[in-house]
Amino acid sequence: MGLPLPLLQSSLLLMLLLRLSAASTNLNWQCPRIPYAASRDFSVKYVVPSFSAGGRVQATAAYEDSTNSAVFVATRNHLHVLGPDLQFIENLTTGPIGNPGCQTCASCGPGPHGPPKDTDTLVLVMEPGLPALVSCGSTLQGRCFLHELEPRGKALHLAAPACLFSANNNKPEACTDCVASPLGTRVTVVEQGHASYFYVASSLDPELAASFSPRSVSIRRLKSDTSGFQPGFPSLSVLPKYLASYLIKYVYSFHSGDFVYFLTVQPISVTSPPSALHTRLVRLNAVEPEIGDYRELVLDCHFAPKRRRRGAPEGTQPYPVLQAAHSAPVDAKLAVELSISEGQEVLFGVFVTVKDGGSGMGPNSVVCAFPIYHLNILIEEGVEYCCHSSNSSSLLSRGLDFFQTPSFCPNPPGGEASGPSSRCHYFPLMVHASFTRVDLFNGLLGSVKVTALHVTRLGNVTVAHMGTVDGRVLQVEIARSLNYLLYVSNFSLGSSGQPVHRDVSRLGNDLLFASGDQVFKVPIQGPGCRHFLTCWRCLRAQRFMGCGWCGDRCDRQKECPGSWQQDHCPPEISEFYPHSGPLRGTTRLTLCGSNFYLRPDDVVPEGTHQITVGQSPCRLLPKDSSSPRPGSLKEFIQELECELEPLVTQAVGTTNISLVITNMPAGKHFRVEGISVQEGFSFVEPVLTSIKPDFGPRAGGTYLTLEGQSLSVGTSRAVLVNGTQCRLEQVNEEQILCVTPPGAGTARVPLHLQIGGAEVPGSWTFHYKEDPIVLDISPKCGYSGSHIMIHGQHLTSAWHFTLSFHDGQSTVESRCAGQFVEQQQRRCRLPEYVVRNPQGWATGNLSVWGDGAAGFTLPGFRFLPPPSPLRAGLVELKPEEHSVKVEYVGLGAVADCVTVNMTVGGEVCQHELRGDVVICPLPPSLQLGKDGVPLQVCVDGGCHILSQVVRSSPGRASQRILLIALLVLILLVAVLAVALIFNSRRRKKQLGAHSLSPTTLSDINDTASGAPNHEESSESRDGTSVPLLRTESIRLQDLDRMLLAEVKDVLIPHEQVVIHTDQVIGKGHFGVVYHGEYTDGAQNQTHCAIKSLSRITEVQEVEAFLREGLLMRGLHHPNILALIGIMLPPEGLPRVLLPYMRHGDLLHFIRSPQRNPTVKDLVSFGLQVACGMEYLAEQKFVHRDLAARNCMLDESFTVKVADFGLARGVLDKEYYSVRQHRHARLPVKWMALESLQTYRFTTKSDVWSFGVLLWELLTRGAPPYPHIDPFDLSHFLAQGRRLPQPEYCPDSLYHVMLRCWEADPAARPTFRALVLEVKQVVASLLGDHYVQLTAAYVNVGPRAVDDGSVPPEQVQPSPQHCRSTSKPRPLSEPPLPT
């Protein structure tokens, strides 16, 4: 039924409006964006002053006054004094105790000091009053030493140490001068008047608290005679009952205003597990050193992808553990964002989720800011809430139960006197509100693990200096309003890559970072400018960095040998489009690059930009503001557009593009000025040579192909048919494809091609003819590729007809093109269509139309599967038989749709169809010779010779009987020879004369080796030896020289290989696999499996074997069997060395009755296979023979995909030979439907085989399609039939199998998708569901007995993303009784 012409024209017009033509694709070209990361290079190496301390740095301190400065570095048993440039001054020995050379030990008197022990420095702080350096170590009960600073010459030195310890005031149960704890101690020194107060916090445990223990928190006053600390100091300590379970880690301490603060990481409560941690802030009064002012507050730091300024929004990720911290004043801009005044101090902290800083989904580290002003307000409000009687609740706890007796607000801790001094404010308190902040950098630190932090204010910006776990320093501007990091620098401190120490010291305008055994001095303004690669990025750097443009690089002025400036940048052209244009026409040229203008919204002033291409000027076009490109935070680009106009003097050829910018107004950072030249633009002359077809229907829709040279030059082109544009579909250098518009009538009209507005020379016409009219289609059924006949009028007017079949869900199309002479009928082929309907056919609408003319639709068209012939070989007819019977699968169903002809010996026979059986009566005149005659069947014009027909005779039967008798006799002789050889070899072994020549491979003995017997032939099931065929010697010089050169990289000398010929791992059709050892050049011995060939005698087959071995050379994956090497003996055949797989192949493993895997075990095996196949697919490698028998299991139960065609054993029931390929044997029951039909293999055919492998696993090795003959399998699958769901198979996994078995390869999943789907199945399996081994599935040889002798082993997790998270269970362990 045809479509009305007005409706058709409306549809064409709508398509024309909606569809983007090729003419506009040039205009839509966009400049490739440049990543911002390309403007900097963080791999640039900077050399900063450093000092190697000879041991891991434990602490650093710095001192500076108006005249002198020094750096102090503590390591185990040593305290180094350095100058301001880290030059060595002197060294003080601090241990081991008991060593006569210990200088600090000697200052405490002769001792005794206990057994010799190394001293680790735990505290290193400056006492500002004297000035002096105070150090506290891990020995001598954690006592401290005072080192006064003495100027000597131009450097500072340490005076003799003073021991801050008085024996009379210190006892095991109460030690006044015990300060440092081996578990960690933090000290802040506050000077009040002429006294120095030490605010000390130490971590404690039961062992440390038993004798000479410091206190958890204490405020100590230094004695004026520097003999120790005043006794009776205020302190708090963890109660004895919580010492073992409640460990407080003190991370950082600082003095700000009237208070001293400590930051701790500790358990959430005394009842929570030790792993449930959070961070707290401790505040003590620095004006009145009283412990009653002790306050604690919880600090919460979160990461939220979409930051919310207040609170901890739902769905954010908490980061409870503090890693490092520092307090500093901030600049005005950041102060506004933090709701504080400029210059106020802010506490910055680096937080992580777990100990190692890994956070799983979010970044590894986050940075939060806590204004000190807001912290104090929150603490004061908490105190008032507890102590004000009208607000306090009887249920509000005072907290700090690990320090004091539990009590409720406003009461003091239990047992305290209720006098004037017992007021609520004068006792330690835990503020129950928490202070919550979100990540300042909004997750932009990503995978960076920050270990150190120091914050400085530099002019109008605040910079965070961060050390990382891999020994790098990041200097980043802090700004909450940005969604990207403003780097000052990002560089490596050295080659060691060790974590940066948490504590950072400042000396003038430099910071001291410690990493490993080194200390580095890093300028706060950054180590340099060379990591900025572009001029614009260089001049946009913060002014405190002092960066400027030095010719072609960014540098500081003192480091620039030539011209250095900070005021302008030249333009840079990185790309342009198009690369060629017509000599006669105009071209719209787009320039891409940077420094064309200062801001994207800038209007280019007139006269500032001059563009020339060769000799031709290019007129600058105004920016198109109607369709601005979306901006990106990670990339940028600037564009200029100009129109290149033709110039008479311009010549054909390649020339340069020049951009000159002058007199541009200056911007905030710099101005744009200079010249940029880019070569590579070509002027060409387009040529049109042919147009086809030159006719079409009046309705239009004809696809015209214009051929010539240089047809894609420039940016605009148009094909005009009688003045109307032909819609462009495709444009390339040599062709233009367009669709003709409707014509006014039947006539020959002019056709022109315009490029760049100029007409291409030539005289061309197009002939509009009468529209074709389709009246009918016959026959009413068919199959993919079969012929149908189109009937109608004016059918030669259309260049091509489109056939479309729609089954209600999907549509397939094909084109029938060419010039035909028949006006009233046209023969075309049906499109490719796969019948998936279980009933064996599909019904739908078959439509046909010619070019843009009205179409015709035939409803109820029946699509059938294509018939497939079965080759019968030789057909013998008895003397009394006069007809031939052959089977042609599916022919009966399509017999009414196509023509069928049958010939015997070239003579036509009047055949008869009975279903799929074709009966051909022999013509009386036909003579059957002794060689027979061919039987040929032609279906729809395609002919196949199915067999040779011969006449049976008595002589032929006698010959058959004689042949059978001869074969039986040969078999008996062979059996006798086997027995004689076996007895002879056993006798020689008993006599101790065991020797084997390389040329006597036919005498190999198959004794049990304890290793799995890999693939056994039917002749060796009883364990007796099987003689191998004697092979002719193949010399190395017989092989291809290029192949030998390629193999040389993996060649292994035969002297380094020992082959245990009495330990046969497996035997197959092509050879034997032995157990052996390989000794490499370092004398490391490796157990391996050695594959040899025995049935290959041709040089070409040996070369093919070597090429398949080379395929494994570049494959490296935990689930792929690796190649150790290839050995070429002086004589004989090559051998391949592979890793020894203890548990043999996967098929024998799952079939073994001694194994008892769960469903989860079996599916996990499948997951590992999918991981290996995902890797093979990424390497563009097609396996072609994926099955359980070709997967191996090593000692850790890791599955390895193997057998890529190397000397593979052949199982007769699982392989069959293809006649066209003499040596090819195919695993038909694992092959995809399209591979069975075309013998072509792809990654999607491997996906089909993977589905069969999953089915094997869940049935524990059952043979697929056990009742289907291999030759009938293709027809079986084409009907939509598949393997049934195994008994223990989850529905979700069977759904995965069915997706692997889709008839359409494009509908099957990729191996990457399969890995994710099978992982979900594994994750959903709970409990132990054992797959029982059905008796029908058991088909194992003697090696199954070997499996039973293997002791139970744990299944270890497999590598990478194939690892199982469940608890391993021995696969050899029987299930528990239920």
From Swiss-Prot:
Active site: 1185 (proton acceptor)
Low complexity compositional bias, start-end: 1349-1360
This protein's GO CC annotations: plasma membrane; stress fiber; vacuole
Main location: membrane
Extracellular face residues: 25-960
Regulation: In its inactive state, the C-terminal tail interacts with the catalytic domain and inhibits the kinase activity. Upon ligand binding, the C-terminal tail is displaced and becomes phosphorylated, thus increasing the kinase activity.
Name this polypeptide is given: Macrophage-stimulating protein receptor
Gene: Mst1r
